[in-house]
């Protein structure tokens, strides 16, 4: 109940910001002659038009400098600079569960000691679960004799056509680095007893969110944010535009997450249990005043963080 109260203190300001964002989008739609009222399916399309109008910035402009292979090299480079973790590709030398998966030997950059094996499963495909996640198949626990960590990062980026570069959005780049923060965490873990590995539930996202911060630093951008055609570094003007737009669309981002979290909390606080999830979701969103122009990030039928395992619930 205390957590719910905390979120409800944030909620009104986030909803108010959504109303401002919707007004900006509606103004553009009206100016362009679109005879519409902004609905949830319009939000992402028109938010990009607003971004372009306010900051002279588009995702397409950013993507040109975010070539996937370069970004992977960049995250490995930063891990070596910060933590002495060296990632050496050995794709083709170890078994993989899908042909597109790349593999890397993980070692201590100073001593050369091999400490892990890293699987990088980058692209979306039929049958693969949605979203992005990190997994360990074996953690380090000296009591059991397990010294080599085996883990993976899994994303759902669009696979480029043969011979074409794979460029990704800023959001996807942040996701790439976020999941790699989890990987760094489990490759640095060094315990005797298995029960002491891992992390408390309220800390689990900390390493990943810290790692996101290195993406937009100048050393990383200068070395690895290179135009996919010319190889030129990302210009300072573009970096400044990205930084200026950091608070853009935060009403949407906050409301879609908070609405999911509030439905989750109220679901677990119901003393009678929930028989009809659809009716419960609609009722709860109506009670908190969910803006009609958007939807919660995780609808209950596919809210994996609630129902995918007993560890989540």
What is the predicted role of each segment?
Residues 94-98, 180, 200:
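A short beta-turn/loop motif at secondary-structure boundaries
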Residues 181-191, 217-222:
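Long, well-ordered alpha-helical segments
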Residues 62-68, 161-169, 196-197, 246-250, ...:
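Active-site rim elements
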Residues 79, 159, 167-187, 208:
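Active-site recognition of the HExxH zinc-binding catalytic motif
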Residues 90-95, 197-198, 303:
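Short, solvent-exposed loop/turn elements at beta->coil junctions and helix N-caps
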Residues 177, 251-270, 287, 291-296, ...:
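C-terminal substrate/ligand-recognition segments
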Residues 1-156, 213-262, 266, 277-280, ...:
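Active-site-proximal, well-structured secondary-structure segments within enzyme catalytic domains
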Residues 188-211, 216:
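The catalytic-center signature of Zn2+-dependent metalloproteases
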């Amino acid at each position: 109940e205390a957590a719910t109260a905390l979120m409800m203190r944030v909620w009104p300001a986030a909803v108010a910001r959504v109303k401002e964002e919707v007004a900006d989008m509606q103004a553009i739609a009206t100016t362009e002659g679109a005879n519409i009222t902004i609905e949830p399916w319009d939000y992402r399309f028109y938010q990009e038009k607003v971004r372009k109008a306010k900051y002279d910035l588009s995702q397409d402009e950013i993507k040109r400098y975010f070539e996937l292979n370069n970004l992977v090299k960049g995250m490995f480079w930063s891990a070596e600079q910060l933590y002495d973790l060296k990632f050496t590709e050995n794709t083709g030398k170890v078994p993989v569960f899908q042909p597109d998966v790349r593999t890397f030997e993980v070692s201590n950059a100073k001593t050369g000691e091999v400490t892990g094996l890293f699987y990088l499963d980058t692209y979306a495909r039929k049958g693969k679960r949605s979203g992005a996640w990190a997994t360990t198949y074996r953690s380090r626990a000296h009591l059991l004799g397990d010294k080599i960590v085996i883990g993976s990062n899994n994303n759902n980026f669009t696979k480029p056509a043969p011979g074409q570069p794979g460029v990704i959005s800023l959001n996807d780049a942040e996701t790439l680095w976020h999941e790699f923060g989890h990987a760094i965490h489990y490759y640095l873990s060094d315990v005797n007893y298995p029960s002491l590995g891992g992390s408390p539930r309220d800390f689990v996202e900390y390493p990943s969110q810290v790692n996101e911060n290195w993406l937009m630093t100048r050393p990383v951008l200068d070395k690895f944010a290179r135009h996919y055609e010319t190889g030129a570094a990302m210009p300072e003007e573009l970096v400044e535009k990205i930084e200026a737009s950091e608070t853009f669309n935060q009403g949407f981002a906050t409301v879609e997450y908070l609405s999911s979290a509030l439905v989750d909390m109220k679901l677990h606080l119901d003393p009678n249990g929930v028989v009809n999830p659809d009716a419960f979701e609609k009722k709860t969103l109506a009670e908190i005043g969910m803006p009609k122009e958007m939807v919660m990030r995780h609808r209950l039928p596919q809210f994996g963080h609630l129902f995918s395992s007993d560890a989540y619930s």
